Each structure stands twice: as C-alpha cells, then as structure tokens.
C-alpha cells in the first residue's frame, strides 16, 4: 500500500511536469467546438474577426455585429464572477469600453472592436457569468451592435490565419513573462 501511494505521487508529479512543458495549440474552429477545447488549445472562431484587445466580432445575417470575449482572454483571465454590460441604445466608437468582466476585486474592461449602437446585450451573463467561459463564441456573447462604420473598421481586425499567428505571439509573450 505504501509503494502504491508512493508510485501514485510520482505519477502525479510527472503528469504535472509534462502538462507544464506541453506547448499550446491554436486552431480555427466552429463556435460550438470551443466548448470542448482543453486548457492547452486556443480556439479561433471561424468566420469571426478578432480585435487586438481580445474581443471577437461576427457579422450577423442582418448586418448587425455580435461581440464577445475571445478564447485567449477567457483562458488568461480564468473564471470570472461578474459581468457589466452596456445599456440598450448606447453609442460606442471602436476602442471605447464596451463590457467589463471581473473576478474577486479585479475588473477588466474590454473595448468595442467596432463603432455602433448597442441593440442587445446578453443579460443572461449577468446571472451566469461563467456562460461566457463555457461557450465563448456561441451562447457566451456579450453585445449586439448596429454598426456605423463597419467597412472602414474591419481592416483593423484579424480573421482566420492571421489570428492564429497573433495568438502564437501572444502565447510566447505570456510564457516569457511567467
């Protein structure tokens, strides 16, 4: 029994060491696939644009833009326990604070990736902030905007393979700082 306990402890230590050495992967996925990704997988939302401040923006069929928090930010922040959303009708410009997430005493503001008027907020997140962590590109969206200058602002956002390269740079930067 003592030998089994000793072997189990060694195995746990080895597993932890291997996990720490494992290099994260980055891939483009369908929105629902991000829900099943491991901690070492960073998911880029297929068909969505990503801002340099880690908000994604997806153009909906009616021309509105759905906005949320990207997988990189949600994994860097961990689980958060509160969300603050803009009021319906709020006018924002690209770069203005749009939504806030918090954990404990800390709060992080995320700027809007595009300019426009808030036409809806995902109020479910106020009562269930972890939904944004569980389903970042599907049910965990934060706001829906009616864009005002989308054609001019889209070139500042990344989509597809450029997001993968940027995530890899961000991961390397984060690991170097650790």
Which ranges hold each PLM region?
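Conserved strand-loop elements at the edges of beta-sheets that form or border functional pockets
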Residues: 59, 103, 112
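Histidine- and aromatic-rich ligand-binding microenvironments
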Residues: 109-115
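Non-catalytic terminal segments and appended small domains
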Residues: 1-82, 88, 108, 121-178
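A structural signal for short beta-strand/turn segments enriched in small hydrophobics and glycine
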Residues: 86-104, 116, 145
